[in-house]
Amino acid sequence: MEKLPDAEKLKWIKAADDEMKSLKELETWKLTELPEGKQAIGCKWVFKIKHDSEGKTDRYKARLVAKGYSQKFGEDYDATFAPVVKQTTLRTLLTIAAVRNMKVRHYDVKTAFLNGDITEDLYMSQPEGYVANGKENLVCKLTKSLYGLKQSARAWNTKINEVMLSNGFQQSKADQCLYSKFEHNKWMYVLLYVDDLIAVHEDDDAIRQFGDLIGDHFAVKDLGEISYYLGIQIERDISGNFLLNQSVKIAALLDEFNLNDAKGVSTPMEAAYMKAEGESDLLPDNELYRKAVGALLYVATTTRPDIAAAIGILCRRVSNPRQRDWNAVKRVMRYLKQTISLKLKISADNNLELVGYVDADWGGDVSDRKSTSGYLYMIGQSSISWSCKKQVSVALSSTEAEYIAASYASQEVIWLRQLLDDLGVAVNQPTLIYEDNQSVIKLAVSDKINTRTKHIDIRHHHLRDLVDRHVINFVYCETNNMIADVLTKPLPRSKLEELRTYMGLIY
């Protein structure tokens, strides 16, 4: 920090002062002598510039972080698990909000982790730059959780969960970060991601009352109508549709990997990539490859299902990538550059029916001839859940590959139906799943065992049970209209553009 210009340095000093003020107000620690036999963990300052939805500087943030890596299990901490919201839950909630014309407001809990209580005796050295005069020999006995501690996330989640439940909210069985309350014949939903809260209700007054309620327990900042969440830019058009995109994230990736001047392409992956392994040199260091694929995977699972198949394929190479694989990664980025303004539309059309599409690319991986499963679930015209996954065994026929894919997709539908039930959306009818293989449909509704299918793992036959219990029902779909095809393999430009439009990706 000493090398920074004075104006810049002052901003960071003020940020650190603000952090210390919050720590003192919450009585995060007490100065004391270190008991014999105890060891004080260290701490450090972490500085970060926060950006808004347009990527511009919002504020300077300084955070005091405990060096939790030196904690000892069973002595300094025990349980550490804390739930994290699923992206599918966010898209589902926004779909319901769009259809019912509900308001969606964003709140940020300041220094959230500092509100959690800890029960262990933990001691920490005094923070650099803020050592108490004349008390240099003392240490901090922690009374509240602090960022960096092993148990901090769990302690905060326990605290906010207590507040929600004590005020009449029900925690979702499908997603522990989702809360709901039915009051005065109207629903309120709250979605929690660490210290970010989304409140959803028909009335502004009800949302403001919720903001006041949370403000009674924690220091809260009202960020207004939702516009930026988990790296996603969210806008609402005049028809009430939500439009999700990650252009800021994509632009940052292009800059990080020096592809700002690269030529855009119209497809994320060439079909020829899958047809042969090809000979090329091993990458000397696969760290850059892993970093790029990881970043692209987040984009693929959040707002861009059109690149999910390409990224799923490239993820298979992370342990031993070659130059051709790295070229394929860069091609995905070039595709994102050309389509950076694509947005995932969450439709306000009056339709909350859950439907699914499932497909498989039989033996598409030439390295081992294993197939790829792909599924897409939509509520009305909104894509809420999708996946691309390589199958673990070699399918002996296209029917077997499609049947395994259908089995995989059916696991998601059970969870989705529970999620909708938690949100008060009726799911009394079987969920329709579109399938383009007639033999799979016959196999799913029949208990016959023949020579061609007797070897199929029994675990996949839970499909029949779901059909018998009227949880799902398969409907034939012509191959040309199978949307999930885009989630199983690289497609030519014309087909890709057609299917991504059906998925709700629009300019």
Predicted regions and their residues:
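Long, low-complexity, charge-biased intrinsically disordered regions
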Residues: M1-Y507
